[in-house]
């Protein structure tokens, strides 16, 4: 039985007790089903004992908890839940795909893209195609696989601005910490790919450490030979509560909004826009 640290309060006990009462189980009944002892369950609930990952998995199974609520139990005990791969294109998520199509369509003419936690592109809107077609060929657009790589590889500057350097630094910092916390090789691969981009500042770690990440940041792009500022806004699509950052499918919608209110992006819209990830 692992002992809980006296100076590290845990919310695991109250949460476990909540689920036990929800299922109308006594400590004895829960212990029997979880191959444990009544004393151990009691110690878990009053904070005298700290659960192992294996114990949490067993309790989640016995209590018939879904991924969202299992994540809550793990977070309450101080563990980062392991991500489970979920195929966004699985037929059982057709309802979610339809909702995302409506969302992306409503954002036209502003360029918007749906991606997974690694930045892999899942869907784009017509605004995205028309906008990026100003700087990239149709072939390059069709072959784009990762939001971050595409965004920075096809919008290079002769002399990268401080805004771009800071943006790259923040994205790298996010990927690096995700990689270290989750030990997910996909994040590590994504980090290495971004680090290899030509405009990455050599002091990206210190830059990112001095900046506070936000849901929106500025990016600068050359549109018709004129430097324009855009707000890059990312919105999370996931479960309510803290598990939105760990439960799957963890989706992100990124949209670019021009800082200049007079910049009309509808001029890039046309009926002939096409892309493998355009679903309407």
Residue positions per predicted region:
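A short, Lys/Arg-rich alpha-helix, primarily the initiator
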Residues: 1-23
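Alpha-helical residues within the helix-turn-helix
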Residues: 21, 32, 61
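Short alpha-helical DNA-recognition segment
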Residues: 24-42
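Short, basic-rich loop-to-helix N-cap that marks the start of a DNA-contacting helix
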Residues: 47-60
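Short amphipathic recognition helices of helix-turn-helix/homeodomain-type DNA-binding modules
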Residues: 55, 62-93
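Hydrophobic protein-protein interaction segments
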Residues: 101-106, 126-261, 266-280
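Conserved hydrophobic beta-strand signature of PAS-family and PAS-like sensory domains
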Residues: 121-122
